[in-house]
Amino acid sequence: MIQDFASDREAAGQAAVSTRLHLEEGAKIRLIQIQRLGNGFTFMNDIGALCEEKASLEVIQLILGGKNTYLGCKTTLQGRESSLNADTAYIVGGDGRLDMNYVAVHEGKKTQSNMQAGGVLRDHAFKLYRGTIDFKWGAKGAVGNEKEDVLLLSNDVVNQTIPLILCAEEDVEGNHGATIGKLDDELLFYLESRGMNREQIYEMMAMAKVDAVCRKIPDAATRAKVQEFLGRAGEEEEAEE
């Protein structure tokens, strides 16, 4: 399932989307969401999912445009051995704001969740990431992981990461981690010695974050739209060749 939210680059306005999913026993859904809205848009996006026994939900999100983006994703892993895998990539610049709230509720036995987010903050951008793994009583053998990797390309950005693990069951495993930093001076020196300027280096590193998630999209036409929005039209075809 592909949801592509797009507009002209200079467009402004508000948009709100709510997606509800009920995965019955053994069902598998891959939900792909791409946000390519204009730089004056405020976008609110909410996902709610319920997974029954051995159901599997994969969520892939690319946040590339808009001024203010608010994301929410709550998945209840109700059935035994149900699973969630969420991958999010973002680029936030200017005075843009990105607010993310991801929740994995483990109710069934041997359920699994993996929530990963990675992106780049530029200029005066603000980003808040909240990731919650909630182990309910009875979720024996459940495993939950959350991780964020943020690259800061300005001293004026505001980055906030709030991981939370709630546990009402003993026989579970929960892990969280975050990597937040700037480009290493030695790496900058090396790349500059190879003929790249600072702007090119920052752009390359930003695109690497998006490309890592974009490659997980199986539809070539959708990947091409992402590259076009990023000003890299034709690179998808070249990479495939």
What is the role of each PLM region?
Residues 1-196, 217-241:
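Conserved beta-strand/loop scaffold segments within soluble protein domains that form the structured core
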